[in-house]
């Protein structure tokens, strides 16, 4: 029975989209539609996708958009999806054979579940890493959302989860954010969607560490404030403000680490101060202390080096 709408946002993905579609071929029996949102591409993304889908006998529909934003592109498709289940995957990732059917099977075994999360594998610089298994989730919505925001459970890669269209309802991805929009979307869904997990790997998630870090270096303060504004809107789901402050600290620490690694110690120090002020688990307290020490050492070294040069 064709019960799944597959949603793929794509921007200049001509080089990868055929591979992503090919990875879905084994799931054709349960796929009712593939909604490809061609988001302001300047290459042949749509044409390549249409040719591949025709060859693979996948029911592709291309939606043209000018969102220039992955969250906005997904939102367009969510508004047009027709099937009872939604599966989202990015245009440069790969689905693993049997993954989608396994997610559906778990939803049949646990009929109350409206969100099913599977394992995934990260691939960085051509190297496969260990499978990331979902852990720590409970049947309680707010507890799952809070633990997710606080980094106490495994994060969900887009492409490793199946969600009922009924549970999604009018929920949409926040737009115009440089990062973490998927976290806010999953957290909002978890508040009301009973969740189940499977340990079977569902997809391979391709990660560019450099591209991920670049998001934190462009207009870092402006982007952080925009993201924090979207984060704080989760209070309308019943999530505690202390949980949102913890998330602020986690993201601020990540930004501080990126700027430290790239030699921008002043920006690193500013974001480290935000992280230090947020509620933390012991491991994050230690990370903050470690980076404070490293910053102090590097700054002292820089001052000493400057004095030697001017002598």
Predicted feature locations:
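Glycine-rich, basic loop-to-helix element that forms the pyrophosphate-binding segment
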Residues: 65-81
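Short, well-formed alpha-helical segments that are part of the catalytic scaffolds
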Residues: 13-26
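Flexible acidic/His/Gly-enriched loops in nucleotide-sugar-dependent glycosyltransferase catalytic domains
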Residues: 100-167
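Short aromatic/hydrophobic "clamp" motif used to bind/position activated sugar donors
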Residues: 86
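Membrane-interface aromatic/basic loop that binds lipid-linked glycans or pyrophosphate carriers
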Residues: 260-311
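Conserved nucleotide-sugar donor-binding catalytic segment
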Residues: 139-219
């Amino acid at each position: 029975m064709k019960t799944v709408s597959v949603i793929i946002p794509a921007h200049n993905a001509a080089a990868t989209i055929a591979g992503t579609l090919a990875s879905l071929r084994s799931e054709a029996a349960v796929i009712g539609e593939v909604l490809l949102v061609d988001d302001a591409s300047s290459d042949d993304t749509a044409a390549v996708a249409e040719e591949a889908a025709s060859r693979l006998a996948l029911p592709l529909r291309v939606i043209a958009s000018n969102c220039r934003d992955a969250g906005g592109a997904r939102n367009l498709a969510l508004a047009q999806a027709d099937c009872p289940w939604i599966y989202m995957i990015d245009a440069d990732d790969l689905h693993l054979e049997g993954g989608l059917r396994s997610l559906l099977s778990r939803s049949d075994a646990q009929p109350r579940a409206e969100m099913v999360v599977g394992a995934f594998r990260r691939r960085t610089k051509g190297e496969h890493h260990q499978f990331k298994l979902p852990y720590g989730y409970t049947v309680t919505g707010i507890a799952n959302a809070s633990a997710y925001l606080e980094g106490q459970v495994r994060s969900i890669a887009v492409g490793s989860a199946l969600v009922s269209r009924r549970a999604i309802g009018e929920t949409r991805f926040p737009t115009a954010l440089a990062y973490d929009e998927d976290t806010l979307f999953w957290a909002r869904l978890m508040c009301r969607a009973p969740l189940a997990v499977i340990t079977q790997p569902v997809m391979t998630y391709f990660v560019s560490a450099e591209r991920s870090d670049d998001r934190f270096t462009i207009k870092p303060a402006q982007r952080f404030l925009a993201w924090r504004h979207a984060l704080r809107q989760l209070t309308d789901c019943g999530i505690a403000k202390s949980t949102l402050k913890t998330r602020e600290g986690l993201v601020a620490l990540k930004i501080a680490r990126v700027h430290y690694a790239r030699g921008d110690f002043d920006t690193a120090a500013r974001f480290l101060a935000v992280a230090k002020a947020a509620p933390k688990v012991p491991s994050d307290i230690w990370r903050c202390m470690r980076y404070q020490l490293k910053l102090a050492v590097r700054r002292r070294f820089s001052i000493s080096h400057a004095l030697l040069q001017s002598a």
